[in-house]
């Protein structure tokens, strides 16, 4: 429809037309934007091979609007309201409210990638030591994470019921068939809870949010805590990198970018040092 309404010459896919179509939407995920780039490149190559004129965007094409989406970091107030809504949810399946309450808190308090949570095995949780073995990671590298005492207590309560309800399932958070829920299931619930804490905001005006934002919120909270204690963030980053399972320190350094500028200045953080460390595209958008 876009091309039919904007192309005055039906026999040519012009550069202007292609670039206009590739303008990235304000809330468009980077993956979707990159997918559109790939699609239009292949289409243009096909048209050229068929004898038509078509502009082929460069392999390393970037657009002024292609900056990675900035995560939506819940404020302390919003975070409290969010988990209140999670805890108030009802369902025909009495197990689901407990699962959601535990799963979302585990992502937030441990900084897990949503897919790491979905792939967690029951056998990888040590309720005695309060540690979790993460095996199905983004870069296929195992790591161990320690839970807070409060998170450990909540998870123990959850597991007590889970082991009775789904003794045959290998997953920590199983669906009714004992398999893992799809990522869209968690995303739909996350957006629903977020909308509930924004009752005065029209649905079409709600910011784009996703479960992954809880992981970003965790990292931001850790950095805030270090700054409050007067810690040297640059020296502490390797610890956060290891805990969160980042492949390189640059991806961890990018979280400093999410902190308020006035907080960084007040804490004496040398921003230019971190800018040199950061990748052009943050790892979480991969």
What are these model-derived regions, one by one?
Residues 1-286:
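Conserved catalytic core of the tyrosine transesterase superfamily
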């Amino acid at each position: 429809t876009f091309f039919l309404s904007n192309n005055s010459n039906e026999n040519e896919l012009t550069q202007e037309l292609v670039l206009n179509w590739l303008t990235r939407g304000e809330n468009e995920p980077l993956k979707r934007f990159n997918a559109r780039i790939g699609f239009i490149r292949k289409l243009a190559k096909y048209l050229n091979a068929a004898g038509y004129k078509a502009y082929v965007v460069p392999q390393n094409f970037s657009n002024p609007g292609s900056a990675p989406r900035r995560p939506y970091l819940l404020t302390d107030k919003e975070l409290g309201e969010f988990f209140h809504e999670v805890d108030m949810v009802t369902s025909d399946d009495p197990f689901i409210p407990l699962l959601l309450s535990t799963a979302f808190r585990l992502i937030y308090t441990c900084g897990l990638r949503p897919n790491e949570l979905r792939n967690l095995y029951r056998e990888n949780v040590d309720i005695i030591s309060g540690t979790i073995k993460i095996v199905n990671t983004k870069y296929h590298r195992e790591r161990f994470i320690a839970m807070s005492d409060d998170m450990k207590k909540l998870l123990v309560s959850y597991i007590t019921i889970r082991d009775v309800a789904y003794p045959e399932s290998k997953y920590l958070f199983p669906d009714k068939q004992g398999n893992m829920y799809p990522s869209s299931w968690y995303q739909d619930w996350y957006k629903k809870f977020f909308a509930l804490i924004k009752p005065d905001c029209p649905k079409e005006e709600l910011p784009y949010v996703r479960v992954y934002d809880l992981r970003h919120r965790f990292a931001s909270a850790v950095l805030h805590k270090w700054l409050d204690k007067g810690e040297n963030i640059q020296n502490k980053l390797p610890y956060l990198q290891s805990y969160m399972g980042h492949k390189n320190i640059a991806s961890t350094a990018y979280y400093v970018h999410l902190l308020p500028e006035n907080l960084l200045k007040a804490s004496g953080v040398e921003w230019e040092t971190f800018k040199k460390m950061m990748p052009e595209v943050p790892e979480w958008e991969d």
